[in-house]
Amino acid sequence: MTEQASSQESVEISWPLDATTIDGTVVRPSGPGSFPAVVMVAGSGPTDRDWKSPLLPGSNGSARLLAVALAQAGIASLRYDKRASGPRARENMQVLVGKLTMQSHLDELASAVGALAGQSYVREDRIFALANSEGTLHALNYQLQNSAIPLAGLVLIAPPGRPVGVVARAQLAAQAAAIPNGDALLALYDEAIARFMAGEPMAPDPALPEGVQMLLQSLETPANLPFARELWTADAAPLLAQVNVPVLVVIGKKDIQVDWRDDGEPLQRAAAGHANVTFLFPENANHVLKYESRPRTELAQPEVLPRYNAPDAYLDPDALTSILAWLAAHT
């Protein structure tokens, strides 16, 4: 199945933002429209418009698959490269070094919503955000900014229901539990993070595993500051409590990065009394909405993450059906 199927059309677009350029892909149903539409917001790091990352193998990104499914359901979509991702990353980062913030990510999303609304076949009053992981924070912040083009609703896939730093530590704690001296290594990690949050040099202990040292170094890279400190305390739950448009929260039970209980429960408490917030916990969906057949107890990051974009990976059917049904009910 390709984006060039007879029932849909795909076009590449670009637009300026400050002294940088953003690239995106619009996929639309065939015909004159007008259509409801979705802007997709990628997760953390160098994740691109397709929800692929140069840090992980494979090119079978979930956002590209979602765009095809949305078009077949009569919904247009725009997915875009964050300015620090995709083929323009090096060019854009010459301008953005030290200037990446939560606000700069919000500016990117606002510009993408404007670019999508500017397409003649899109219904400006029926634009939704479909966001993954860190992207859910930007989608929530956008809706709370009294933006010029408010969203009709939000689909939040794997939102962190705890501060991002707490979620990251929980992931590391799970890995530390499986290795000798895990508790001692976790204490060294905590000490480095405490220095980071205090604005001091992190100086991670050389005893920490290479992967953990790389994570810590990425937070302290000049290009990522002050964004990394802002992100580390960001939490979707208090933001969700303030949103007044329909929201679908999706956390797969096979997600090993965001936990459907530990993150889902704070989000459910935050949404208490909000009749327009719906929760979905698909039995077999992973962090990027792909189907995972193995039992949750057998899943570990070293094996799971490299499979996110494998050629044979596909969207979880139950999750996809529910998302499309929710969008249909709100368009």
Where would I find each of the regions flagged by the language model?
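Short beta-strand/loop motif that positions the catalytic acidic residue
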Residues: 243, 249-251
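Short, surface-exposed "cap/lid" segments of acyl-processing enzymes
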Residues: 31-34, 38-69
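Alpha/beta-hydrolase active-site loop
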Residues: 97-119
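Catalytic active-site module of serine/aspartate enzymes centered on a nucleophile-bearing elbow/loop
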Residues: 288-289, 295-331
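Primarily recognizes the serine-hydrolase "nucleophile elbow" in alpha/beta-hydrolase
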Residues: 115-121, 125-175
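Short alpha-helix in the alpha/beta-hydrolase fold that links the catalytic acid
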Residues: 245, 256-270
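N-terminal cap/lid segment of alpha/beta-hydrolase-fold proteins
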Residues: 2-33
